[in-house]
Amino acid sequence: MKPLLSVVIAGVCAATLHTGAVQADEVKVAVAANFKGTIERIGKEFTAKTGHTLAISSAATGVLYTQISHGAPFDLFLSADAATPEKLEKEGKGSDRFTYAIGQLGLWKKGGPAPDEATLRRWKGNLAIANARTAPYGAAAMATLTHLKIDPKQYRLLTGANIGQTWQFVDTGNAELGFVAWANLVEAGKTAEAWAVPADFYPPIEQQGLVLKKGAAVEALVAWLKGPGQAQIKAAGYALPQ
């Protein structure tokens, strides 16, 4: 009987693995520009563990809102704020809203020395900033200037469509100074060239997710972001939700 039992168990295991492979699916993720690199890294481990793959589309939060409102076929929205997912949820576009990270703002001067508040106050040159109307990190940057009672007109502002483009402005030398996502600085190993803007200078950048289309693969990814993925999110330069 033992050989027969072994064959039966082996057959059940093989069937389970085969079923898992068939059920593996692709999750279409709309992600805010600041979180693109992080979700790509998380996605590799998630795929290795679950078999589910990610199809990632990245843009400014406001741009993604417009796309989702017009029926873009995404399964999950990872926003750079809380207001946009909340608005979409009220409009009946999604459900199961959750906070996955708290964003942090940085002021970057490529090549250093690291800037600080005094640098920002005396600066008269180019300053890169994301569009405050569509990019939450841009809104946080403008809130920082308001908090410090600095008139933005003292700078030559270069406005990026999203925080990724703002990074490019500084990285290419088009702007000597720029507000960027701290996570992007961590990813590039550039934190020594930047100032971590104090969190009380701007409203919390509470980054929320919204399920747009329910399914097993989407549920698995959400669970991963709330669980094993939190370590990677913290390592990427974000604060974690309480």
Place the predicted regions along the sequence by residue.
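Exported/periplasmic ABC-transporter solute-binding proteins
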Residues: 25-49, 55-58, 62, 66-70, ...
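Bacterial N-terminal signal peptides that target proteins for export
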Residues: 1-9, 19-20
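C-terminal segment of classical bacterial N-terminal signal peptides
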Residues: 14-22
